Amino acid sequence: MKILSFDVGIKNLAYCLLDTEDLTIDDWNIINISVDPTCDHVNKGKCCDKTATKMTKDSGFKLCTSHCKIKLYKDKKLRNVPKLDNRMLSLGNQIVKKLDEKKNFMNMDVVCIENQPALKNPTMKSVQMIIYSYFLMNGKAKDIQMINARNKLKVYTGPKIECDIKETYKRNKFLAIKYCDIMIRENTHIDKKFHKLYDDSKKKDDLSDAYLQGIYYINKLND
């Protein structure tokens, strides 16, 4: 059975496609669903991916808050980047487009989506429901599960990880990253290319959440 697990985000949508046999990973990555324009400044051949707040009046070259201040653009006439007329519609269209590109997602049996609080962050809740609606309407998922974020930390059964972080949110992020790092290396059936992907990622917290949530659901199936 194939389990497709999503960690919900407004800019980064992490996913993990797992096989219940041997708990192997078929696909694991981050989808950039941001609709906000990004900074065009290039440093050492790499384009800045931060959200642009200003743009040059002459060429429309976009800059983030940090790069607006550097000497190279100091004498440029800048204006604010125009706001999207309907950001939620643009975000919804972007999510559908990105999901359509992932043909292997249609091979899943169950979709797991991290449940979002409706009042605390309504945009995140909307993203959750767009993903839910997408898989509901294509009719191929046998089940779509909303998973409480607290459950992902329940899957680790190894030695206790020492952590002196008191703030709950940061503590949970730290532990999720540690748990995931240990678990993917202990499972010898997982392709080592995913070890490298995880090690190289700047979004280990999102990748961890998607993986651990999928494992939580699989464990529930076996209870």
List the predicted regions and their residue ranges:
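Phosphate- and other anionic-substrate recognition elements at nucleic-acid/protein interfaces
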Residues: M1-D223
